[in-house]
Amino acid sequence: FLMPLMDLVDECHFELGSECVDRVRMVKDEKEQQLMIEASKINDLVVDEVINICAKGNLTEKEVSDQLAGIYQKHGCTGNSFEPIVAYGKNGADNHHSGDDSTLKPGDSIVIDIGGLYKGYCSDMTRTVFYKEVSPKQKAVYELVLKAQKAAEAMIKPGVRLCDIDKCARDIIAEGGYTVEFNHRLGHFIGRDVHEWGDVSQNYDIEVQEGMTFSIEPGVYLQGEFGVR
């Protein structure tokens, strides 16, 4: 309806203005920042609770995922901020896995990617743990991903380009022998939506500003084996 109507007005030139709004939303004011901090603190508690639930070893991925909305509500959230990911073993190599009836086996990795909606603002956090046993390969990949995460986080300050933060983490993982196994952007902006406009990726040379809120989530995904994020 709108586009044909615009075509009828010859003397006017229309420009899409959504990017202007998106850029304003990239920077959060102090009140918004505090809400984001509170949302993330709640997410810390929920992640710990989910890890303890998984440690019992008697629930499927789906059964764990189905409990999450209630857990978030118990901690003051409206519910999930996105469809949760709880992925056991080889399922963790699919970074968009949807929970199924898979059960835990000793030596499985558990990728937990969850978030809650708190007073209109989203959290998003990923953690990887291992059930009962950890192989040398799993430990090495975990430590590599953690090294990349810490190095990227250490770069974050006003004036640093988002693409350079992405490159820092990607280079470290490549030095560890993995390139195509890190198959997504390093991070995304978070706020009232869990995925707001803007990426921490090679596609964005925007400089960091105080008040920006975004994720840093490097990963390595070994098909048929396990994933770490």
Language-model regions, residue ranges each:
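Active-site neighborhoods and metal-handling regions in enzymes and metal-associated proteins
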Residues: F1-R229
